[in-house]
Amino acid sequence: MLIEQFICREDNFGVLIHDERSGYTAAIDAPESKAICSALKRRNWTLQTIFVTHHHHDHIEALAELKQIYKAVVIGPEAEKEKIGHLDQALQPDESLFFGTHTLLALSTPGHTLGSLSYYFPQENLLFSGDTLFSLGCGRLFEGTPAQMLNSFKKLRQLPDETLLYCGHEYTKTNALFALTLDSHNQKLHQRVEDVFLLRAKNAMTLPVTLGQEKATNPFLRWDDRTLRKNLAMEKETDEEVFAEIRKRKDNF
């Protein structure tokens, strides 16, 4: 499977996935028509499908135009069907489906929105998490609760370390600075921060990243880490309380 990643709008990631065997191409979300069409033209691909992660405007703005141009089939969460509009196929939580010759799972990951989906290709170890899991970060809880987002992160943390993560926004540099405020003695985090700053200095993208790297450095995936809990002075609190505190601190960062 081939992947084309590019920037849309200001900091949205545009992502195209292409199955070489079938010739099928899909977009993960539809943040900007011009950027997506340019990427398709650059690769000489034709868009057949759009997988929507959630209903926020910066992820669905180009749906109508892309449907008109390519007659693409739009697939997304049943729970947000009315808010998204343009859906041709509505998915139930954790439903499995095919893209070309590949199987994918529409993992239910509520928190950022109540119907948020993360698309996981188990055979290829690819995860497209939308605005749920960011590199070194976590989506804001616009609709869900800390408990819901924690359960979503527990689900994602179970995926293999070699899984490649693609997410919805280039927020990694800011997330890295926040992570250091909580986990300053984490040498793996310091190395990751250095790498991120070097990439951004060249205006290069910081994704994809392996889930293993995220498990070792992303504070939102480390709610049960003893050192992090000690740094938060929350050694005896519940996982939910720790996760909620990290999210609260990020909101105020």
Curated annotation (Swiss-Prot):
Transmembrane segments: none annotated. SMART domains: Lactamase_B (SM00849). Its EC number is 3.1.2.6. CDD domains: hydroxyacylglutathione_hydrolase_MBL-fold. Zn(2+) 2 binds at D58, H59, D131, H169. GO terms for biological process: methylglyoxal catabolic process to D-lactate via S-lactoyl-glutathione. The keyword Cell cycle does not apply. Belongs to the metallo-beta-lactamase superfamily. Glyoxalase II family. Its cofactor is Zn(2+). Keywords: Hydrolase, Metal-binding, Zinc. This is Hydroxyacylglutathione hydrolase. It comes from Bartonella quintana (strain Toulouse) (Rochalimaea quintana). The gene is gloB. The lineage of its organism: Bacteria, Pseudomonadati, Pseudomonadota, Alphaproteobacteria, Hyphomicrobiales. Thiolesterase that catalyzes the hydrolysis of S-D-lactoyl-glutathione to form glutathione and D-lactic acid. It is an enzyme of class 3 (hydrolase).
